């Protein structure tokens, strides 16, 4: 025959290499029996072998095995069989994957491929070996004791391959949290140093002084092209959302099963669905629990359900009787099924920008890709929209790698296009539904207001400025600031207006004056909380006004407003609908009119203070405040409370300035000596700053002068005493000694006189009058 048999390490593993010879199954025979069968075979000799492509390192075990045939006996060389025998064993399977068992695979019929594909030195094989993708991963450890969580391994069955591979990534480790290193990756460099064997890799990774470790890993590029990364799948499936899962699952279960050649439908009922009820089709979203599966989405409520599709999609094509646990893998459920099942009910006409040809081509490419990936090239029939059921032609003259590259390129292009189209469609539908909901809400409020008898009108509480907006340059009176939301405080004590108006709801509008925020009050069904959403579309408002607020009612028809978090801020206050009419008072308090009859004609000016029952309305205890947007020096904005008094004073100052300016051209008549001068707020600030600086300057001068005098006193010597002063001091000392001797007090000296030195004689007192 011109070739030698390969030697397997274990004779009982012979079935892993050679499957059939001239249609006779050899998987259960020993090596000697296989050799005898080869010798006894007649020409032409057709041998079916099992080979694993070397470019699928690191892939899951369900893709490591591919079934190929040789054309004639001279196309298989000894070197090729030896290379197949030296391939490393498959990597450990993932937790949710089951390895293929050859006995569970469907029977293999003869296939003929290009013999040049199996030559060891062929250009395609060399090209495949070089199709590697390199990625640099940097892992950071918090301390030296932390482990990366990588189990490195090397090959023992091939001396030429000295590469270091990642055998396992421990869950909840640093490498697993990073997510870029996967099982089967080859480690090329560690911290910029090439590693040749396992000892070098372990030595570098276990160094205690290294906390940041940079790894250069390589993996087959086709592995990344065949399967989506988890991040890409999540990003793509986020566009569809979880709301279409129920519709997608029902659509897949309703699709008719696909016919299949062979007896691989064993164990599955004829005509029934390909999967049991307990098994769920994986659409790539990753939802497994019932609570998430039954969850409803707001977008699903708005967009509505699409009609179920009866077109065969890859979601239904997957169910061709393979019910064994060995075939229940994540990669077997192709991720693009969600896209096709979603668009199957739409058709190419409902996707603007995607023609019918592109749509059908996209489906066909995905189906081909699914079948090629999972080794099910034979016996698969799929339906096309243009021409019913037709068999998939698998006798291709071009190589599998070239075909897969073309498929990947076209799939990426169409996938990107479909993603953008579907995203734009969903956004457009969402906008339309929101617009309809807003219009229905507004119409219901208008109808509610029109149906009620119009007993009275309650205007919003606002302040009439002293001047019109067009004549004022105040920041408080500009168009935008007048629309600022007023402060909401506790309602007024119950009045006849409120008692008579209970149960009635009106739309409060201000027919004139500056625009103010309106509070919508409706009457929903009793016992149910009012929860709705209002979308502001007034271009003059310039900002979104409010979202929803829960209004809970007690049995005594009392209204409690519940605010959570930032909703308590009046800057973010909301529209209210209540069963009773609620009264608000804003920046400036406005008391209710005298009677209900005078409500429409009551004066709203600040000068005429309304009275109730002849008694003036009670003033607000707390100072009236309002919200104002302030700007910091760095340009950022913040909201602060400011008393209304500041705004009134500023408006008064502007009015005074306008009255005093431009009256005459006589400089003497408008001089500050006669008219006085009004200092603005900025000028008063400058005055305070200058006064503070002058006071500091005076204090500094006084302190300097005192220090100077103190230095002069300490530096000069004691001055010499004058002789006259010394004589005077001595005389006074003698005199005092005579008068105040023996502790004679002044009173005694004045009353009784002075004693003599010996104490025997007493002189006349000083106050006695004598004549000479």
From Swiss-Prot:
Cellular compartment(s): Cytoplasm, Cell cortex
Region (Disordered): 239-320, 450-573
A Pfam family annotated for this UniProt entry: PDZ
Coiled-coil residue spans: 394-424
Cellular component GO terms, alphabetical: cell cortex
Keywords annotated in UniProt: Coiled coil, Cytoplasm, Phosphoprotein
Statement: the UniProt record of this protein carries the keyword Oxidoreductase: no
Name of the protein in its database record: PDZ domain-containing protein 4
Gene: Pdzd4
